[in-house]
A protein has these predicted regions:
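Catalytic Zn2+-binding segment of zinc metalloproteases
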Residues: 81-97
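Structured DNA-binding interfaces in DNA transaction proteins
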Residues: 1, 90, 119
Length: 490
């Protein structure tokens, strides 16, 4: 094309892309056209409200004011301009700032809350209202990594006339990453194992701390949701949509914590540089992540269950919504790749490792906490979660959700759980709890007996995991919404 332009497309698609055409011989960029699909504004506005609404009083009502929307458009276009210049995503960037720094208003004013606009780090959901962050600094901007990477890619090198002559200088510049961590890029071949390279994260140097702060803001957003979306004479469709997006944000943040389990810290190094590319995350950090999920994800998040909202959008459905959200977290913890990494960590790190058996025992204690009570009583939300757990185990023992080499783990865990249920049954006087536990014990017996085990059911979270791991330019702006019918990606 003769001109490189920003195109605004009349489309309901919630996305934007920045493709370019380049000469494969030289790398010269010949043409680029940023494509802004109209409904990317709906997506980005919803993210701003859900992630940073409690930090900006002017964002308490939807739609957002024009000047805030203008800042959001600037952010989206700048990210896509990066692609047109040849920059790939850098999911490592946001984890290079300590979590406390993204709450420091002086730091954020100077450095932003992420070093790179090419990260999938959206609006600052970690900062708290009392931190006093300037609302103008809640939106990502071109950061120190972007400036440094632009110089590395485009700054002339006097005297160099060939790529080979440029190489020593470029390598010297690249080594600045060793002293300045926010110049670092994603590690090659990390394969999703580094929680510092997760998407849609802020302050993910410590995902547990960041998510703990994030859910405080989500509780505030839930109180804002009804007045923000209510319009005289209109239905509650927008309220239902935003509530599903809030649950999606909650799910993403919990998945950030799940990424710590079986994870590694990675740092790109080449020949001649000391140190390892991959270092196992210490067992104490992994165990802390599971404890957090037991307390925050598997214990019912009461702030997400607001009758004033729920009775305006549907006659029933909250049990299914929360089950879908919690199921995605549980399934993420039990993926074959994660369990395999933990198995290899046990082999390589020995007693220092957080082992697969440790994970399963901690999950059992967190999901079936009531079994240890003097008089067990399990409510409907927790029965839903525990049934989800049994189905996940069934899919691993009798289905294709785990390789045969892992099956013994899940069979042993079900036997332990069956014993705990048997010991708890005489102590409960609550009829629903008794009936549920009796049924759960029978389910376990059928799962473990190949003569009676029914076919395993497909996991809703398998396609979710694949979609969330996609980080190509075509998926820069991907929303996760939790509905009563399942998980929607758009």
């Amino acid at each position: 094309a003769r001109y490189s332009v920003v195109r605004w497309l009349p489309s309901e698609t919630e996305n934007a892309v920045g493709p370019h055409v380049h000469d494969p011989r030289s790398g010269e960029i010949l043409d680029s056209d940023i494509q802004m699909y109209h409904n990317v504004m709906r997506l980005a506005s919803a993210w701003y409200f859900i992630q940073s609404g409690p930090l900006n009083p002017r964002a308490a009502k939807l739609p957002l004011p024009d000047d805030i929307l203008g800042k959001i458009v600037q952010f989206v276009v700048a990210h896509e301009v990066g692609h047109t210049l040849g920059f790939p995503h850098n999911m490592k960037a946001s984890s290079m700032y300590e979590t406390a720094k993204v709450r420091d208003k002086a730091w954020v004013k100077k450095m932003g809350h992420t070093p790179s606009i090419m990260d999938y780090s959206r609006f600052n959901y970690v900062a708290q209202p009392e931190d006093g962050i300037d609302p103008a600094d809640l939106v990502p901007r071109v950061g120190p990594y972007d400036i440094w990477a632009t110089a590395w890619g485009y700054k002339p090198i006097p005297g160099a006339t060939t790529p080979a002559e440029e190489r020593p200088v470029l390598d010297e510049w690249a080594r600045q990453q060793e002293q300045t961590p926010w110049f670092r890029f994603m590690t090659s071949n990390a394969r999703g194992a580094d929680p510092g390279e997760i998407t849609e994260a802020v302050g993910d140097a410590d995902p547990v701390q960041a998510t703990g702060l994030g859910v405080k803001n989500l509780a505030r957003v839930m109180k804002m949701l009804l007045p923000a979306t209510e319009k005289k004479g209109e239905d509650w469709e927008n309220l239902e949509d935003m509530y599903g997006r809030v649950l999606g944000q909650w799910t993403r943040e919990m998945l950030h914590v799940a990424g710590v389990v079986g994870g590694v810290d990675s740092h790109q190094k080449n020949g001649g540089q000391a140190g390892l590319l991959f270092t196992t995350i210490p067992a104490a950090r992994q165990r802390k992540a599971v404890e957090f999920l037991s307390a925050q994800a598997f214990a019912t998040p009461a702030y997400l269950v607001d009758p004033a909202i729920l009775r305006r959008i549907e006659p029933d459905g909250v049990l299914a919504r929360l089950r879908n959200a919690q199921s995605s977290v549980l399934e993420s913890l039990l993926t074959p790749t994660r369990v395999q990494r933990m198995t290899e960590q046990e082999v390589l790190d020995g007693d220092k490792a957080y082992k697969p058996l440790d994970l399963l025992a901690d999950l059992r204690r967190g999901i079936f906490t009531e079994l240890a009570a003097p008089a067990p009583k399990i409510d409907a939300f927790r029965r839903n979660l525990q049934q989800t757990y049994l189905e996940a185990m069934h899919n691993r023992v009798n289905g294709g959700a785990a390789p045969p080499t892992h099956r013994w783990l899940y069979r042993g865990e079900l036997k332990s759980l069956s014993g705990e249920i048997a010991r708890a049954l005489p102590r409960t006087s609550d009829r629903p709890t008794r009936l549920f536990l009796e049924d759960a014990k029978e389910q376990i017996a059928r799962i473990l007996d190949p003569k009676f085990a029914p076919p395993a059911s497909p996991s809703l979270s398998l396609p979710l995991r694949r979609a969330l791991e996609a980080n190509g330019a075509e998926s820069c702006w991907q929303e996760l919404t939790i509905t009563r019918d399942g998980i929607k990606l758009q």
